[in-house]
């Protein structure tokens, strides 16, 4: 990322802070890949692997952002560049619920796991159709926070993914209400219920409810001092998969919080990327 000046329609780059790095490393350019759904445009991107050869096939990773009221863009995303360097296609989309497209687009209250899930599956379908080099039998899914919630949800509703990495996730809005530092405001607002007003509705939106349907090997990554998506949420989903015989592991980071991937200790951020790629390599490569 650099500073630019836009004047009279002319863009001029002012800095070159990353020139040395770019000259010594391969940075894979994301390809803009929007899809249309019932007259609605969803902005997505595809990053081909660093060693892309159109005559070869590669595993692919669906990456899901947090929020949900955040948004991906055509920016340098370190985690995705690491995956591309390891030989993966990486694809990601701003589903309904994302920011930057107005309130109506971002409002998915009481629709978690429904309209967003449809968008992720439709996007994946179209990416696979456009890129026959992606092996449909070697697909992975990962995400953090809301992206972790959706990773938990997805593996309970489809068997198309051969591996998953659920990061700083939550899986149960009933318990999350009482243990998350934002649960008592976020959950009633987004799920339109509390444990006292409509516990059945909250349970319908809980990925852990669908644990008996999961077959996808799943790694859980959590920080011990994460109070947004507390450790108890990760443990619930992990324990549920273990109980139902699904291959799963959990990796915990001491002294880290919800910001591990962004502002955690460098050695921990490096380790997180290692355990993430190691799990995916074991199941997809």
Annotate each language-model stretch with its function.
Residues 1-4:
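Structural motif
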Residues 7-9:
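Short loop/turn segments that connect beta-strands within beta-propeller blades
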Residues 15-137, 142-144, 178-179, 185:
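Cap/lid segment of the alpha/beta-hydrolase catalytic domain
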Residues 95-285:
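Active-site-proximal cap/loop segments of hydrolase catalytic domains
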């Amino acid at each position: 990322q650099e500073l630019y000046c836009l004047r009279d329609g002319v863009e001029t780059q002012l800095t070159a802070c990353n020139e040395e790095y770019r000259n010594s490393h391969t940075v894979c350019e994301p390809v803009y890949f929007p899809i249309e759904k019932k007259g609605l445009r969803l902005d997505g991107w595809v990053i081909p692997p660093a060693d892309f050869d159109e005559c070869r096939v590669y595993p692919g990773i669906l990456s899901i952002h947090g929020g949900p009221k955040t948004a991906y863009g055509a920016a340098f995303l370190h985690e995705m560049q690491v995956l591309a360097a390891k030989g993966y296609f990486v694809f990601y989309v701003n589903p309904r619920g994302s920011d930057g497209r107005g309130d109506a687009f971002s409002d998915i209250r009481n629709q978690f796991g429904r309209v967003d899930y449809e968008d992720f599956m439709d996007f994946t379908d179209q990416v696979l159709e456009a890129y026959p080099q992606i092996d449909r039998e070697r697909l992975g899914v990962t995400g953090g926070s809301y992206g972790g919630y959706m990773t938990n949800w997805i593996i309970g509703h489809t068997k198309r993914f051969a591996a998953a990495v659920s990061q700083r996730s939550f899986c149960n809005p009933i318990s999350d209400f009482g243990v998350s530092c934002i649960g008592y405001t976020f959950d009633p607002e987004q799920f339109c219920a509390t444990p006292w007003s409509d516990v059945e509705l909250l349970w319908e939106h809980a990925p852990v409810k669908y644990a008996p349907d999961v077959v996808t090997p799943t790694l859980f990554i959590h920080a011990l001092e994460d109070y947004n998506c507390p450790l108890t949420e990760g443990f619930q989903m992990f324990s549920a998969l273990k109980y139902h015989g699904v291959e799963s592991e959990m990796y915990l980071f001491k002294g880290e919080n919800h910001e591990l991937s962004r502002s955690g200790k460098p050695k921990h951020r490096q380790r997180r990327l290692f355990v993430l790629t190691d799990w995916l390599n074991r199941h997809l490569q």
